[in-house]
Each structure stands twice: as C-alpha cells, then as structure tokens.
Amino acid sequence: MKVKDVMHKGVDWVSPDTPVIELAKLMQAHDIGCIPIGEEDRLIGMVTDRDIVCKGLANKTFNAARATARDVMTTGIHCCREDDDLTKAVHHMETLKVRRLPVINKSKRMVGMVSLGDVGQFAPVDLLSGCVKGVSAHH
C-alpha cells in the first residue's frame, strides 16, 4: 500500500504571518490538529494545537492578540513521498515521534498529509501497533 492511497489529499497551508487566533479557529472549524505553514511556494513549518499551547499560551510573554504562526511553528519539517510504501512512512513517523507527516510529490510539492488516524484505518494491525507505541513513547 502506498502513502497516496491513505493520505488526506488537497491540504492547504497558511502564511507564517497568519495570526495564531486564526489558526485556532481554522483548527476548530476543520476539526484538525495541525496546519502547514508555507512561504514563497515552499513548506517552511507546521503549527499543531500543542505548539499553540506549549510555545504560546504557556509562555508568560505570549500575546495571543499579536502572535503569528511564525512565533509558534515547528521548523525543519520532515516529509514523505506519495509513492512511498505506507510501511516506510509509518517507520518514519515512529522514528520522529510525530503523529502527522506532510506528503510531497516528485516535484516536491505538498499534495496531502498522512496521520496516525489514517494509519489506524488502513494499516495492518502489527504496523499500527508499532506506530502507536513509537509515536506515543516519551521523548
């Protein structure tokens, strides 16, 4: 099974200048836990609901009214390719201890997102079990 067979297709990204409050509203409206951040046609980061809490709200100097995606995003994003075997992507998620991976095509354009939930719906039980254990392990 390939990543393209299980991923969420057509994921959009937002600018690093997008207000954090808007990010939270987008997450709520679309029932999602992360939003890719792009600039000049390149994926430059990701913001998760956890980033907003841990890098933002938990910080005494954080100003939610002024904060942008750039203030809370995680950079150095790892991806997988749409033609990768799902097993390869799952092992990548385990190693990185991440619940989501952006998916790129041969032209290095983001075409989707694969999540732990996607793995749960489509992967064999043994692969799913290993992924959940790896991703859930304490950092």
Located regions from the model:
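Tandem CBS (Bateman) regulatory domains
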Residues: 1-10, 48-79, 85-94, 113-139
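The conserved cystathionine-beta-synthase
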Residues: 13-31, 79-97, 104-105, 123
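A glycine-centered beta-loop-beta connector
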Residues: 27-30, 35-50, 93, 101-117
